[in-house]
From Swiss-Prot:
Source organism (scientific name): Aspergillus flavus (strain ATCC 200026 / FGSC A1120 / IAM 13836 / NRRL 3357 / JCM 12722 / SRRC 167)
GO biological process: cell wall organization; pectin catabolic process
Disulfide bridges in this chain: 50-93, 184-193
The name this protein goes by in its record: Probable rhamnogalacturonate lyase A
Stored SUPFAM superfamilies: Galactose mutarotase-like, Galactose-binding domain-like, Starch-binding domain-like
CDD domains in the record: RGL4_C, RGL4_M, RGL4_N
Membership in a protein family: Belongs to the polysaccharide lyase 4 family.
Major site of localization recorded for this protein: secreted
Annotated Gene3D superfamilies: 2.70.98.10, Carboxypeptidase-like, regulatory domain, Galactose-binding domain-like
Leader peptide range in chain numbering: 1-20
Amino acid sequence: MLSRTILFSTSFLWVRVANAAFGITTSDDSYVIDAGSANSLKFTVSRSSCDITSINYYGSELQYSGTGSHIGSGLGSADVSAVEDGDYIKVTCDTDTLTQYFVVHNGDSVIHMATYTTEEPSVGELRFIARLNSELLPNEEPFGDVSTTSGGEAIEGSDVFLVDGETRSKFYSSQRFIDDQRHCVAGDAHRVCMILNQYETSSGGPFFRDINSNNGGSYNSLYWYMNSGHVQTEDRRQGLHGPYSMYFSRSGTPSTDIDTSFFANLDIKGYVAADGRGTVSGTASGADSSFKWVVHWYNADAQYWTYTSSDGSFTSPAMKPGDYTMVYYQGEYKVAETSVSVTAGSSTSKDISGFVETGDTIFKIGDWDGTPTGFRNAENQLRMHPSDSRMSSWGPLTYTVGSSELTDFPMAAFKGVNDPVTIKFTATSAQTGAATLRIGTTLSFAGGRPQATINDYEGSAPSAPTNLNSRGVTRGAYRGLGEVYDVNIPSGTIVEGENTITISVISGSSGDEFLAPNFIFDCVELFQ
């Protein structure tokens, strides 16, 4: 003790260390968990509701005082227990259909969490929300104030705002699951990050994105959305979601490489340890090498993904045993699909090959990559509303093959706003035979789909796409089910010389301006 007193010569610093006593303090109303960390972390969990009602880190209260941090919108009531087991503390909150876990390791300023479900919450989404002190933690990372809505005026629903002349929304904080291992809120002296190691029981696949943070003024919200109805493309999965970790630091940004294998020893429902898993290894080939390649595995119970190496080789994350659909993407565009079985304790070898197949191209606008990248306003659409003054004019636009820039073609077509989209091109005599106009889309809203007219020939009206029942382009989303439409053009329709194609939005629904039926372009190609 003498040496510690000499080392920490000021009473202030000595008190910080002396108070770092790992353990649980129990009262009638709550459990206070002390992480025993050098930069002291103590948090309080309600014994009746499972809400986190206090987070004290390095002497500062980071929890918003008005409402707790919790799973969903709060459990309301739960059976809450806490146990200390060696260097670990586990808080368990049980309801009939959900179990929430908070886990602390002695000496670490980290709250590890996991959520076990047997059915989807009645609200149709599953998330953890930390409501944090916006005075001490005003900033959002990595995308900045695009999702800071404090002081704004609502311009669409209750989730898109105008702030100092800029459109903002909590949805603009999103990042693709495959790229989102960490997102944070921060201030001058504190940073809190959500570290995401496991998406296996989430829904939507590698390119799904959802709300990550939102400074709404009273508090700064730090989220992990496990699933939601926000442009959701598949059924929700049940089981163990996580582990996921809330990491507290004074200034530095934490690594995303966090070992949570100790969950195997903590009696966590649904946790599958490494020795109960298998992997898939192989080589992907055939797609355009100018794009990143992704391999994706999924079934009703789990999902996994990985980028391939530059030579196409890949090894999956450790997967639960089972039969999986295996998909190969060029960017976000599916080029191949197969199936594979995974066995615990072994690695399965499985190659996959595929490419984009069309024909002899007359023209192509954009790329078959499953995204609107390069088109007008695509660069801004993730982080602002289509009405934002920083957006370029939506048109209607005319794109002339051979002379226009890609930004002369809109990323989205809105019924009655910027449709029809016009394409002008010059054909040779050899190109006047039968042809196919292929219109790739990434997302539809309100039944919007393309109908094309080639010179005097009107293509057939396609049937309505699957309704995802969610706003998309106005909330920073571009990925849905990726419908592709082919227009079969009879011989003689295309003439030697100048030709005109118009693409209109058709739908039996209606809406105002950017909530009118619409769709987002992936690529438009004319080929024979």
